[in-house]
């Protein structure tokens, strides 16, 4: 029995004609499909039941045998085997071709494999195959050469001249003969010799030919199998024909394509039998070749075959390629049972780990569970009556549903699922209505809001799946973001506003300065209405210190007392050992969004996830309650326009008039005038904003919303009540006419018109960049999907040195941020020689702070970049799992997490321009395209010139151009670089530079850096550049995610000289495999190969993976499969994608084999077993 778990690998290769006949159940001889009167398949046609099996279960074509009892009988009348109709999905047929036909993938692919083997150009090959020219097969004793092309006229001339002394042919037959004659071993030796001797184009061509020849030798494929004598016909249920309502038929395009092949083949047979003239036969053969081409890959050569309405027909290749192809549509994106979707509404009364499930949906989803429980409880006699009860929705069904649903988690997912927090598990609570209720705190993780978003529900069925959902996916366990380890469940909007209002204080309100003997008394006074929630009061606090009660009077407000009741009082914000501060409230200042984040971070670090979930719920209750009580809302009167605005605008007008006057007098250029005007207006806008902020009361609702981080920003307040300021035109150039009004006053027509440019551009950009970002994520996932934590420690001594990342004087990422949660690669010692962190220990927050204080600027840490694990990475090189704060577990799919961590904010960034309404500001265009350029390792736009040698800079300027010469006096070498017009220099005359330093401003080409400075420099450069883009957008991503992607980009070695190994020059080979091969060679006393590390872009790297299934499902499906088939590749099923494609459990997390092989044994059984074992051992010892 074929079981999915039973196989380790999957192999692809070329099929020989014998193999195709072996697969087949019979030959398809007629182009007929089904009889339109009886609607039964025609015999020997494309749907023939004799070949492919019966259309109805257990029933032959003529109806002589019906029922299961005749299973396996072959009907003597119609020849159909009595069996299940399902076999029509697996039984294949074949067509015996009257003339051989070339397989288009191997002719037209790039590079043309057939062309390389025969050493013919693709054009020459095409001429022969499509009957334009003759090719000499055997020159005999004539002056012709083998494989020489002859036109019709030349052929006739030579025929008259030499008669039968030479042989030439055309079409696939001739090519087949040439392919059969190839001696691969001999050719391989010749090519290897040629590679050693030749140079330039000739050598490159020889290397490419050798690659193909070697592939055929290693895989055991024969070259002539690229020519088809027999064409396989795929099972009929994979190319179905169905009857539509009006009696017409809809059929798969493949049937049309097969029909054309069969018609032409039959006609060719007839012509050959009749002995028709050569020219007619040749034309028919060419048509047959074209028909087979169209079937395999329509449109690859010439015009595609079209169906009704000029639509190109979908060929076998099209069935596989692209988003709608077999790989991405059906193998990686299956639809699943036990799922539903509905609109979401907010459920503030839920706990963090709960969600509201509509009753009718729950009943349908849990139907089998409910039916079983009904039978178990004796409410129904058997499953059939239980099913009827559920379908009629009897009242007793609801009680049973409640029981079934209890403790059975469900998964909620919102598309687009940009990171793993887009699917989480919740405990369902039945609700009336037809909407799913979602807890407000999980919205940020899903990026969900309640303006009509929909979510999907999935039910984990098996016990294992339920356990995983409960322990790994429950929302209460996913409080931290995997990308940076910060809490993702931070309160937002109303909750923030409520807490802000609650912890504010105000002067001159009732009850100010009163004393209370305890917090409880203060609360009572507030509830009875004697004091205001914001009044500054004195309260006597009592605490137990070292077993004795002590008390002290502190100043606070009732609001702060209420807020502190919701959070633990040991978070370390207050020094509890100092008697001065020991009695203070943990949080005694104004709480805004960032402060809430810090509080939750501490709660998680100190008390763990369960307590954090409780605290979150308490903060949520408080927030909603007090934002309601405060009744904060926006009204037009809250938008206070500052009095100074008029004066500031007048000053600006005068300033602009002065600038214009200077320009007219010719004192400044047009460019300077423009810059100055823009600068003036920007300053004015700033001043107006400052005046506005000073005017607003601190209890002004709009100010509170922005200041607390609940909603809106300073920028938006400026537009409401200050002035909108400068706008950009469609090209992105800033229009020098500012918008003086704000939305409170209203814009005039011209101002409104100017502002539409920015708004429209914002929307268009958003739409485009969302797509770009999604595509970037897809490539990142594909390149890193097989990186899984596979071992404890790879044992390497290597590591990378990290220091803070700076851009000019600005620190982009602090050193402590970069080393927290990483493993030290060597002892970290302060100046006095005290060890702060030992080698192979994790650096935590406190230690990182110590390192900072000790003034250490460079630290060596373990990194995925230097990890020696063959597949994936080890725990030590990866360090802390950011989502849990512990050392990463074996089996964690860190590659996919890395891709999501980088891709998810990509989309966030892309969606950012949209909210400001298009006010001129920093656009992310340097953002996303820059990240893409780095990961694809492209030559960047605005290239910086870098020096290849170290030395002193000499700058020479002649009339037309500037040159920089770098002189290395020690080794007496110098190099001169031409500086393009308009570049800004980064160096001064006489300055000393290192090899690899930039001479001009701009981005460095990573490939040049790799050549000059080596691997470490490139890795560090890519990492820092990617970080700069994200940090400038205010997005934090941990280094290790970017390191994993860079590791995947640099996994391969490009072989330069193969030595005596079997590798080919110019071949890309896995670094570890390269080292292995060399080790083997050295052991045998042979010459090892030399090579250099290659830097591949993520697309290239994803296509260069060992798994052909993963590569084929990514991009360029036909090219990948062609290549894999010739090489006879074996896919070892190591990554995640390949296993999903063939339907095995993925080898990550609980699917890792080390976890799958665990069996659960009862304790008593185990003890018994051990006793028996012990007795056996004792008996053996005594004997």
Swiss-Prot record:
Belongs to the RNA polymerase beta' chain family. Keywords: DNA-directed RNA polymerase, Magnesium, Metal-binding, Nucleotidyltransferase, Transcription, Transferase, Zinc. Binds 1 Mg(2+) ion per subunit. Binds 2 Zn(2+) ions per subunit. One of its GO terms (cellular component) is DNA-directed RNA polymerase complex. GO terms for molecular function: DNA binding; DNA-directed RNA polymerase activity; magnesium ion binding; zinc ion binding. Zn(2+) 2 binds at residues 794, 867, 874, 877. Mg(2+) binds at residues 449, 451, 453. One of its GO terms (biological process) is DNA-templated transcription. The keyword Zinc-finger does not apply. It catalyses: RNA(n) + a ribonucleoside 5'-triphosphate = RNA(n+1) + diphosphate. The RNAP catalytic core consists of 2 alpha, 1 beta, 1 beta' and 1 omega subunit. When a sigma factor is associated with the core the holoenzyme is formed, which can initiate transcription. Its cofactor is Mg(2+); Zn(2+). The lineage of its organism: Bacteria, Bacillati, Bacillota, Clostridia, Thermoanaerobacterales. This is DNA-directed RNA polymerase subunit beta'. DNA-dependent RNA polymerase catalyzes the transcription of DNA into RNA using the four ribonucleoside triphosphates as substrates. Its EC number is 2.7.7.6. Pfam families: RNA_pol_Rpb1_1, RNA_pol_Rpb1_2, RNA_pol_Rpb1_3, RNA_pol_Rpb1_4, RNA_pol_Rpb1_5. InterPro entries: DNA-dir_RpoC2_beta_pp (IPR012756), DNA-dir_RpoC_beta_prime (IPR045867), DNA-dir_RpoC_beta_prime_bact (IPR012754), RNA_pol_asu (IPR000722), RNA_pol_N (IPR006592), RNA_pol_Rpb1_1 (IPR007080), RNA_pol_Rpb1_3 (IPR007066), RNA_pol_Rpb1_3_sf (IPR042102). The keyword Magnesium applies. Zn(2+) 1 binds at residues 60, 62, 75, 78. The gene is rpoC. HAMAP family: RNApol_bact_RpoC (MF_01322). CDD domains: RNAP_beta'_C (cd02655), RNAP_beta'_N (cd01609).
């Amino acid at each position: 029995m074929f079981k999915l778990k039973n196989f380790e690998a999957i192999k692809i290769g070329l099929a020989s004609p014998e193999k195709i006949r072996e697969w087949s159940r019979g030959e398809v001889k007629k182009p007929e499909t089904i009889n339109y009167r009886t609607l039964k398949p025609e015999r020997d046609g494309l749907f023939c039941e004799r070949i492919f099996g019966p259309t109805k279960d257990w029933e032959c074509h003529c109806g002589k045998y019906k029922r299961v009892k005749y299973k396996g009988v072959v009907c003597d009348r119609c020849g159909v085997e009595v069996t299940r109709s399902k076999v029509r999905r697996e039984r294949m047929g074949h067509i015996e071709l009257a003339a051989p036909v070339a397989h288009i993938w191997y002719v037209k692919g790039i590079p043309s494999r057939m062309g390389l083997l025969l050493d013919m150009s693709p054009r020459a090959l095409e001429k022969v195959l499509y009957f334009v020219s003759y090719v000499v097969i055997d020159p005999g004793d004539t002056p012709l050469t083998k494989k020489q092309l002859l036109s019709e006229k030349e052929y006739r001339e030579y025929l008259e001249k030499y008669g039968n002394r030479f042989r030439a042919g055309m079409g696939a037959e001739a090519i087949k003969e040439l392919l059969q004659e190839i001696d691969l071993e001999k050719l391989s030796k010749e090519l290897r010799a040629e590679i050693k001797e030749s140079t330039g184009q000739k050598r490159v061509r020889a290397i490419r030919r050798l690659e193909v020849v070697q592939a055929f030798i290693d895989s055991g494929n024969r070259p002539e199998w690229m020519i088809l004598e027999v064409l396989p016909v795929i099972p009929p249920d994979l190319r179905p024909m169905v009857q539509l309502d009006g009696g017409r038929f809809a059929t798969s395009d493949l049937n049309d394509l097969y029909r054309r092949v069969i018609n032409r083949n039959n006609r060719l047979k007839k012509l050959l039998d009749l002995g028709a003239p050569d020219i007619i036969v040749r034309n028919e053969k060419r048509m047959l070749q074209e028909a087979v081409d169209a079937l395999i890959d329509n449109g690859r050569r010439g015009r595609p075959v079209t169906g009704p309405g000029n639509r190109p027909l979908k060929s076998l290749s099209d069935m596989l390629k692209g988003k709608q192809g077999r790989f991405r549509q059906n193998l990686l994106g299956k639809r699943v049972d036990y799922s539903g979707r509905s609109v979401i509404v907010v459920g503030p009364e839920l706990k963090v780990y709960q969600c509201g499930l509509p009753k009718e949906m729950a009943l349908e989803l849990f139907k089998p569970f409910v039916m079983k429980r009904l039978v178990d409880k004796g409410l129904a006699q058997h499953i059939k009556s239980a099913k009827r009860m559920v379908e009629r929705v009897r009242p007793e069904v609801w009680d049973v549903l409640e029981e079934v649903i209890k403790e059975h988690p469900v998964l909620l997912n919102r598309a687009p699922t940009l990171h793993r927090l887009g699917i989480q598990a919740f405990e369902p609570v039945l609700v009336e209505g037809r909407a799913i209720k979602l807890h407000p705190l999980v919205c940020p993780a899903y990026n969900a809001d309640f303006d009509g978003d929909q979510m999907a529900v999935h039910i984990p069925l098996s016990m294992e799946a339920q356990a995983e959902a409960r322990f790994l996916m429950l929302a209460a366990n996913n409080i931290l973001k995997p990308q940076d380890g910060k809490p993702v469940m931070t309160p937002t909007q109303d909750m923030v506003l409520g807490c802000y209002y609650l912890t504010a204080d105000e002067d001159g309100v009732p009850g100010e300065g009163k004393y209370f003997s305890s917090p409880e008394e203060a609360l009572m006074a507030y509830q009875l209405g004697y004091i205001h929630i914001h009044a500054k009061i004195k309260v006597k606090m009592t605490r137990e210190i070292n077993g004795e009660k002590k008390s002290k009077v502190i100043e606070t407000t009732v609001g702060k007392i209420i807020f502190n009741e919701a959070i633990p009082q040991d978070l370390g914000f207050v020094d509890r050992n100092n008697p001065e501060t020991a009695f203070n409230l943990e949080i005694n200042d104004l709480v805004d969004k960032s402060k809430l984040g810090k509080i939750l971070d501490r709660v998680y670090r100190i008390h763990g996830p369960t307590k954090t979930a409780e605290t979150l719920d308490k903060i949520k209750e408080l927030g909603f309650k007090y934002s309601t009580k405060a009744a904060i809302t926006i009204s037009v009167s809250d938008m206070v326009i500052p009095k100074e605005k008029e004066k500031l605008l007048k000053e600006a007008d005068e300033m602009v008039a002065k600038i214009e006057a200077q320009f007219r007098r010719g004192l400044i250029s047009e460019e300077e005038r423009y810059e100055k005007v823009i600068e003036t207006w920007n300053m004015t806008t700033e001043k107006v904003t400052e005046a506005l902020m000073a005017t607003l009361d601190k209890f002004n609702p709009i100010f509170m919303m922005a200041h607390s981080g609940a909603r809106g920003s300073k920028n938006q307040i400026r537009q409401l009540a200050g002035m909108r300021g400068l706008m950009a035109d469609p090209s992105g150039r800033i229009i020098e006419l500012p918008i003086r009004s704000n939305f409170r006053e209203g814009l005039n027509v011209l101002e409104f018109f100017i502002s539409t440019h920015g708004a429209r551009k914002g929307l268009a950009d958003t739409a485009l960049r969302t797509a770009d970002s999604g595509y970037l994520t897809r490539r990142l996932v594909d390149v890193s999907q097989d990186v899984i934590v596979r071992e404890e420690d790879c044992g390497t001594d290597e590591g990378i040195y990290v220091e803070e990342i700076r851009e000019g004087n600005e620190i982009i990422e602090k050193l402590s941020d970069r080393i927290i949660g990483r493993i030290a690669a060597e002892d970290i010692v302060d100046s006095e020689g005290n060890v702060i962190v030992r080698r192979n220990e994790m650096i935590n927050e406190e230690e990182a702070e110590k390192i900072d204080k000790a003034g250490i600027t460079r630290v060596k840490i373990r990194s995925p970049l230097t990890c020696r694990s063959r597949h994936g990475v080890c725990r030590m090189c990866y360090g802390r799992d950011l989502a849990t704060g512990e050392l990463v577990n074996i089996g964690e799919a860190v590659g996919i997490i890395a891709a999501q961590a980088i891709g998810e904010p990509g989309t966030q960034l892309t969606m950012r321009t949209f909210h400001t309404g298009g006010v001129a500001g920093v656009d992310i265009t340097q953002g996303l395209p820059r990240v893409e350029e780095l990961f694809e390792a492209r030559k960047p736009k605005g290239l910086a010139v870098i020096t290849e040698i170290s030395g002193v800079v000499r700058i020479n300027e002649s009339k037309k151009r500037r040159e920089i010469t770098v002189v290395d006096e020690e080794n007496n070498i110098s190099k001169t670089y031409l500086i393009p017009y308009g570049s800004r220099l980064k160096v001064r005359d006489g300055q000393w530079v290192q090899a690899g330093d930039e001479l001009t401003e701009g981005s460095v080409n990573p490939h040049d850096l790799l050549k000059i400075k080596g691997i470490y420099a490139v890795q560090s450069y890519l990492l820092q550049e990617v970080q700069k883009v994200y940090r400038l957008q205010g997005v934090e991503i941990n280094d290790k995610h970017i390191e994993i992607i860079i590791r995947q980009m640099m996994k391969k070695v490009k072989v330069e000289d193969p030595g005596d190994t079997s590798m080919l020059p110019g071949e890309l080979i896995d670094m570890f495999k390269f080292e292995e091969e060399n080790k083997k060679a050295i052991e045998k006393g042979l010459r090892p190969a030399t090579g250099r590390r290659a830097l591949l872009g993520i697309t290239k790297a994803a296509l260069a993976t060992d798994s052909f299934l993963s590569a084929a499902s990514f991009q360029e499906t036909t090219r990948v499969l062609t290549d894999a088939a010739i090489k006879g590749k074996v896919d070892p099923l190591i990554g995640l994608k390949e296993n999903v494609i063939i339907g095995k459990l993925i080898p990550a997390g609980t699917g890792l084999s080390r976890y799958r092989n665990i069996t659960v044994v009862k304790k008593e059984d185990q003890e018994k077993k051990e006793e028996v074992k012990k007795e056996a051992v004792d008996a053996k010892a005594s004997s």
